[in-house]
């Protein structure tokens, strides 16, 4: 009790929100089991302002909701999501933005990180640049903690359940009956893209009542093993630790087997863990060289691969990806395109460009994604599969000049902010 009180006192003195690990709002209520999927269990005004180290956000109101969801074994969970209201916003247009948390630790979750600008929360701070662009369109935004209370990065189906139940909860928050004319678009980058696509795949059976107009995603990861092999011995080697730790959080058999291939590594947010393992050899170094060929490890990874499921999105998908992405191999995108487009009813547009790295690709593709979503609100006709090559996705037709300028200048600002990126090389 003394330690708990001391932590609360310290948090109050420093004027930062309570860490989710000691914040009772993140704990499920006693009536969790009697609630329905998507029910709002608790809600509150955002304890502290949403704060970005890069941009000002056009926010009129911000709330956090706790929503009933479930894990991959259908066990009940309480998921926290953040709802952001823009000035003069249109409540009938909702973006579910899946942040690229990429971390197996609750204190890295978007609901907390967007209130605490720091090196530890840098990935969510960068994502707030994109969220600001969405709010400037007059769209409501919900940002789910889709990894859940156990931080199960990168578990596909639980991510999907959390996303869909957070949308349900947001609609119920504004309309207690849950019946509304709200149109929702899914948006995400990096693993946020994977969560968005899994949500689009399971939605017809899991949440058929939701009116999803489409999913706009960038740099998705169709094959986790190929991703691991690509980032190993590079600046983002630490992501391999986060992937293994996140899967271990969800699957006990995976955790028990992983120990045979190396000691369990510390939990951490994306950038601190990448700094710790900067350019280290992970497979055949930190972990035994045979870790990816072990049947338990391999099977657990495969069930979370987009390429391992025959189910396909039943809503239109816009996917932007650089041919030169240094983290998610473009060959895997082509495999996904072939798999999906071989099936009837798939509506997929791929915007391929020549952005020279993962971060630049995010900024060049996001204005195209927003432009594509704007057309989806208006039910513009789409059909079949389309794959277009461009030098840069800044050249995507119809992008508003102010939107292009906002993302170009934001990219330059992030590149110039060396005091954060330099941390990864120390």
Swiss-Prot record:
In the record, what terms sit under GO molecular function? triacylglycerol lipase activity
Stimuli inducing this protein: Expression is not induced in medium containing Tween 40 as the sole source of carbon. Expression is up-regulated during the yeast-to-hyphal transition. Expressed in host cecum and infected mucosal tissues (stomach, hard palate, esophagus and tongue).
Q: What is the lineage of its organism?
A: Eukaryota, Fungi, Dikarya, Ascomycota, Saccharomycotina
Per the record's keyword annotation, is Aminoacyl-tRNA synthetase included, yes or no? no
Q: Which SUPFAM superfamilies match?
A: alpha/beta-Hydrolases
| Protein name per Swiss-Prot or TrEMBL | Lipase 7
Disulfide-bonded cysteine pairs: these are 108-269, 341-385
Kindly give the InterPro entries that the UniProt entry links to this protein. Answer: AB_hydrolase_fold, Lipase_secreted
Q: Which domain of life is it from?
A: Eukaryota
* Keyword annotations: Disulfide bond, Glycoprotein, Hydrolase, Lipid degradation, Lipid metabolism, Signal, Virulence
What organism does this protein naturally occur in? Answer: Candida albicans (strain SC5314 / ATCC MYA-2876)
Q: Where is the signal peptide?
A: 1-15
Query: Is Hydrolase among this UniProt entry's keywords?
Result: yes
For this protein, what reaction is catalysed? a triacylglycerol + H2O = a diacylglycerol + a fatty acid + H(+)
Which enzyme class? hydrolase
Q: Which residues participate directly in catalysis? A: 190 (charge relay system), 358 (charge relay system)
Q: Which family does it belong to?
A: Belongs to the AB hydrolase superfamily. Lipase family. Class Lip subfamily.
């Amino acid at each position: 009790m003394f330690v708990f009180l001391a932590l609360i006192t310290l948090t109050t003195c420093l004027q930062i929100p309570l860490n989710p690990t000691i914040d009772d709002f993140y704990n499920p209520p006693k009536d969790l089991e009697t609630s329905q999927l998507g029910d709002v269990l608790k809600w509150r005004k955002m304890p502290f302002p949403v704060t970005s180290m890069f941009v000002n956000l056009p926010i009129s109101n911000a709330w956090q909701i706790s929503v009933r969801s479930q894990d991959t074994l259908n066990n009940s969970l309480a998921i926290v999501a953040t709802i952001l209201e823009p000035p003069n916003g249109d409540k009938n247009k909702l973006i579910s933005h899946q942040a690229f948390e990429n971390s197996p630790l609750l204190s890295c979750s978007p609901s907390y990180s967007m209130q605490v600008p720091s090196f530890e929360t840098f990935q969510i701070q960068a994502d707030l640049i994109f969220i600001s662009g969405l709010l400037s369109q007059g769209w409501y935004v919900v940002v789910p903690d889709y990894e859940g209370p156990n931080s199960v990065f990168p578990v596909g189906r639980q991510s999907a359940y959390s996303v869909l139940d957070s949308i349900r909860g947001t609609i119920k928050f504004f309309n207690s009956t849950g019946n509304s004319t709200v149109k929702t678009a899914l948006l995400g980058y990096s693993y946020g893209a994977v969560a968005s696509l899994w949500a689009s795949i399971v939605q017809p059976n899991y949440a058929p009542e939701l009116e999803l107009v489409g999913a706009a995603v960038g740099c998705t990861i169709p094959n986790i093993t190929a991703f691991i092999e690509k980032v190993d011995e590079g600046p983002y080697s630490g992501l391999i630790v986060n992937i293994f730790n996140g899967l271990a959080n969800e699957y006990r058999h995976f955790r028990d087997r992983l120990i045979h291939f190396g000691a369990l590594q510390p939990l951490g947010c994306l950038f601190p863990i990448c700094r710790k393992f900067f350019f280290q050899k992970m497979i055949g170094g930190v972990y035994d060289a045979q870790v990816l060929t072990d049947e338990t490890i391999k099977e657990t990874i495969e069930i979370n691969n987009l390429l391992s499921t025959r189910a396909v999105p039943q809503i239109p998908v816009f996917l932007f990806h650089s041919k030169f992405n240094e983290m998610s191999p473009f060959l895997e995108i082509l495999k996904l395109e072939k798999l999906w487009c071989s099936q009837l009813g798939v509506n997929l547009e791929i915007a391929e460009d020549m952005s020279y790295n993962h971060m630049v690709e995010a900024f060049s593709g996001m204005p195209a994604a927003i432009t594509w979503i704007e057309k989806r609100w208006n039910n513009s006709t789409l059909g079949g599969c389309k794959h277009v090559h461009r030098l840069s996705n800044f050249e995507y037709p119809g992008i508003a000049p102010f939107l292009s300028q906002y993302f170009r200048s934001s990219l330059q600002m992030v590149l110039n902010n060396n005091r954060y990126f330099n941390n990864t090389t120390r």
